[in-house]
Curated annotation (Swiss-Prot):
Originating gene: rpl18
One term under GO cellular component: cytosolic large ribosomal subunit
SUPFAM superfamilies to which the protein is assigned, alphabetical: Translational machinery components (SSF53137)
Keywords recorded for this protein, A-Z: Ribonucleoprotein, Ribosomal protein, RNA-binding, rRNA-binding
Signal sequence range: none
Function recorded in the entry: This is one of the proteins that bind and probably mediate the attachment of the 5S RNA into the large ribosomal subunit, where it forms part of the central protuberance.
Organism: Haloferax volcanii (strain ATCC 29605 / DSM 3757 / JCM 8879 / NBRC 14742 / NCIMB 2012 / VKM B-1768 / DS2) (Halobacterium volcanii)
Oligomeric form and interacting partners: Part of the 50S ribosomal subunit. Contacts the 5S and 23S rRNAs.
Similarity field: Belongs to the universal ribosomal protein uL18 family.
Name of the featured protein: Large ribosomal subunit protein uL18
HAMAP family: Ribosomal_uL18_A
UniProt-listed GO biological process terms: ribosomal large subunit assembly; translation
InterPro entries: Rbsml_uL18_euk
Pfam families: Ribosomal_L5e (PF17144)
Residues that span the membrane, as ranges: none
Length: 184
């Protein structure tokens, strides 16, 4: 295994494919809080974090499960819920006194229009100042879930099991976004 002077064992979190230390160092050198966006198939998480000597300090956080408080009934792992989670995290960050941040996508691939950038766009629309390129942000119809509603209309059976009808997703998105904006 790791015997001899020419063999270098990577750091534990790098071996576990959890941390890109080169990217983390670049983000920390910026001196701004990080908007940490993490996505899975079921949920989306967004946190505003600053580094500290005893470890990172979280100033504001939101998960897509928090959207239930604002009337979200759709699944929580899709693009519209990622946008709303970023919006909620941005509002909470502004309430905590954080106004600027940089996006930390972790080990996610920087594909234009994906859920990580939807979190960023939601936080920007909430009022956070985050440096970005408009080319990576999804168009507004995609953030609202129009593509999901169009796909659901083509199917013979419902897209989601349960009471929620995916064809109403854009209207539902607008309703929940209105609830988030009223909560100011």
């Amino acid at each position: 295994m790791a015997t001899g002077p020419r063999y270098k064992v990577p750091m534990r979190r790098r071996r576990e494919v959890r941390t890109d230390y080169h990217q983390r160092l670049r983000l920390l050198k910026s001196g701004k809080p990080r908007l940490v966006a993490r996505v899975s198939n079921k949920h989306v998480r967004a946190q505003l974090v600053t580094p500290g000597p005893q470890g990172d300090e979280t100033h504001a956080a939101a998960t897509s499960a928090d959207l239930d408080e604002y009337g979200w009934e759709a699944p929580t792992g899709n693009l519209p819920s990622a946008y709303l989670t970023g919006y909620l995290a941005g509002k909470r960050a502004l309430a905590a006194g954080v106004e600027k941040a940089v996006l930390d996508i972790g080990l996610n691939t920087a594909t234009p229009g994906n859920k990580v950038f939807a979190v960023q766009e939601g936080a920007i629309d909430a009022g956070l100042e985050i440096p970005h390129n408009d080319a990576v942000l999804a168009d507004w119809d995609r953030n609202r879930g129009v593509h999901i509603a169009e796909y659901a209309e083509q199917l013979d059976e419902p897209l989601y099991s349960g009471e929620f009808d995916a064809t109403n997703l854009p209207d539902h998105f607008d309703e929940v976004l209105g609830n988030l904006q009223e909560d100011e």
